[in-house]
Amino acid sequence: MVGANDQTFEEVKPVLSHMGKNVIHCGDVGAGQIAKICNNLILGISMAAVAEGMALGAKLGIDPQALAGVVNTSSGRCWSSEICNPWPHINENAPASRGYQDGFATQLMLKDLGLAVEAAGQVKQPILLGGMVQQMYQQMCMRGNAHLDFSSIIQQYLPEQV
């Protein structure tokens, strides 16, 4: 996610390609930051949605592994369900399988959601889901879970089980 004029982008692209496999020119200066804010807004919302769905399925009695199998081969599939599923042991490499340690901290997701809500306010763009999810992550931080991976949002739904 890069914001720069065309000439500058072409000059720095070889260096940036050593830092990541996808180097996307988003527009002028600042456009990369806008893309990051929007991407993380979507990520925060999608993680909360996956957590909500997984929690509902568990409460209704379906095995979380079976539910994840359905979701990840169906229309609900996304990065949050497949790579970083908030239910422990769906993906052994996910932070949920390590006690929500060593991931993208909840406090960082809260910061990014705050940036998105602020930016939306500046251009008078409603982001209803973003505001709701921001409040959920804020509650997690207030409960002392700011350092946990943001997938720990599932604890808002099933604190006694995960």
Where in this protein do the model-derived segments appear?
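Helical "substrate-binding/catalytic lid" subdomain
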Residues: 31-161
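Rossmann-fold dinucleotide-binding core
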Residues: 1-41
